[in-house]
């Protein structure tokens, strides 16, 4: 008949059921109370080792098989039993020394179960489920942590960029508004307030010469305590006024003359229209001649 230990070696899932009869047979052979701790320790340690480290099953099963033959052939050799107990203790401590990360699984194995072999056999799936849950929770935590950290690290930079862009836009808008307000509210140049003496001297000079040379303009500016620009602007304004007055006087004289002729009856209404056109043409020609004269004088001043 095949021994249950060989069945355990062949099928790793039946380890707890195969080791339980061995514990009963060892108790039946010895009948002593001091040997009860050894099989219990061996069963619990074997179940833990097989559940956590499947590669060590053969080594532990072979040592256990040799211990079983020692119990059958040498009942009174207590020295061999002590060696077996030391070997079991070394096998029990080796997984803890070699693999610190599996402390959780060994701690779960060390808790004794009162339900018997079926509960021991059902413990590896529970461990697998816990390990799978731990394995599934670890990547999710690892996947979530970098995302949160990236958000926390990037959000201040984005906030600073957005705030900087808003500040720049606000500053540019304020600068544009200030520039527009300055342009719109730019005060006009104050008009030069000439004194009566200055106006008298300028009018006397204009009566003699409508256009000034550069040298004469400089002399007048020095004598009247004015700038050359002020003298130049005054003469320009005075010429424009004189042209308007002259044109108005000529037109008024022509109209008075026409009215006198009409009253006398020497001119017909058709002739009046022709005379009016002629007078207008004469006034236009005189204005054009004055403008050309102004341009000639300005060119002469430029050459000077």
From Swiss-Prot:
Induction / repression: Expression is repressed by ZEB2.
Protein name as catalogued: Homeobox protein MOX-2
Pfam families: Homeodomain
InterPro entries: HD (IPR001356), HD_metazoa (IPR020479), Homeobox_CS (IPR017970), Homeodomain-like_sf (IPR009057), MOX-1/MOX-2 (IPR042634)
Function: Mesodermal transcription factor that plays a key role in somitogenesis and somitogenesis and limb muscle differentiation. Required during limb development for normal appendicular muscle formation and for the normal regulation of myogenic genes. May have a regulatory role when quiescent vascular smooth muscle cells reenter the cell cycle. Also acts as a negative regulator of angiogenesis. Activates expression of CDKN1A and CDKN2A in endothelial cells, acting as a regulator of vascular cell proliferation.
Upper lineage: Eukaryota, Metazoa, Chordata, Craniata, Vertebrata
Annotated GO MF terms: DNA-binding transcription activator activity, RNA polymerase II-specific; DNA-binding transcription factor activity; DNA-binding transcription factor activity, RNA polymerase II-specific; RNA polymerase II cis-regulatory region sequence-specific DNA binding; sequence-specific DNA binding; sequence-specific double-stranded DNA binding
Bias (Basic residues) ranges: 63-82
Subunit structure: Interacts with RNF10. Interacts with TCF15.
DNA-binding region: 187-246
Keywords: Activator, Developmental protein, DNA-binding, Homeobox, Nucleus, Transcription, Transcription regulation
Cystine residue pairs: none
Domain-related comment: The polyhistidine repeat may act as a targeting signal to nuclear speckles.
Biased composition (Polar residues): 87-101
Cellular component GO terms, alphabetical: chromatin; cytoplasm; nuclear speck; nucleus
Gene3D superfamilies named among the record's database cross-references: Homeodomain-like
Regions of compositional bias (Low complexity) in chain numbering: 112-137
Stretches with biased composition (Basic and acidic residues): 158-171, 183-192
Cellular localization per UniProt: Nucleus; Nucleus speckle
One BP term from GO: skeletal muscle tissue development
SMART domains named in the record: HOX
Region (Disordered): 63-192
């Amino acid at each position: 008949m095949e021994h249950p230990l060989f069945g355990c070696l062949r099928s790793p899932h039946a380890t707890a059921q195969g080791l339980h009869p061995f514990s009963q047979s060892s108790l039946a052979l010895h009948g002593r109370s001091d040997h009860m701790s050894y099989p219990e320790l061996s069963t619990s340690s074997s179940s833990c080792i097989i559940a956590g480290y499947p590669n060590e099953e053969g080594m532990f099963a072979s040592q256990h098989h040799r211990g079983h033959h020692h119990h059958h052939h040498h009942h009174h050799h207590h020295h061999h039993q002590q060696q077996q107990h030391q070997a079991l203790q070394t096998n029990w401590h080796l997984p803890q020394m070699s693999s610190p990360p599996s402390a959780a699984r060994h701690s779960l194995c060390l808790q004794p179960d009162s339900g018997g072999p079926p509960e021991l056999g059902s413990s590896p799936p529970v461990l697998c489920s816990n390990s799978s849950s731990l394995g599934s929770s670890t990547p999710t935590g690892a996947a979530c942590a970098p995302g949160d950290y990236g958000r926390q690290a990037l959000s201040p930079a984005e906030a600073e960029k957005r705030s900087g862009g808003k500040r720049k836009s606000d500053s540019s808008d304020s600068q544009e508004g200030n520039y527009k307000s300055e342009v719109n509210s730019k005060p006009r140049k104050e008009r030069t307030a000439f004194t009566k003496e200055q106006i008298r001297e300028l009018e006397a000079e204009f009566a003699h010469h409508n256009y000034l040379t550069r040298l004469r303009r400089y002399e007048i500016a020095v004598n009247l305590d004015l700038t050359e620009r002020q003298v130049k602007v005054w003469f320009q304004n005075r010429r424009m006024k004189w042209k308007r007055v002259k044109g108005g006087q000529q037109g008024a004289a022509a109209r008075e003359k026409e009215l006198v002729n009409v009253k006398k009856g020497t001119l017909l209404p058709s002739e009046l229209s022709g005379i009016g056109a002629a007078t207008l043409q004469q006034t236009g020609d005189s204005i054009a001649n004055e403008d050309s004269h102004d341009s000639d004088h300005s060119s002469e001043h430029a050459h000077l």
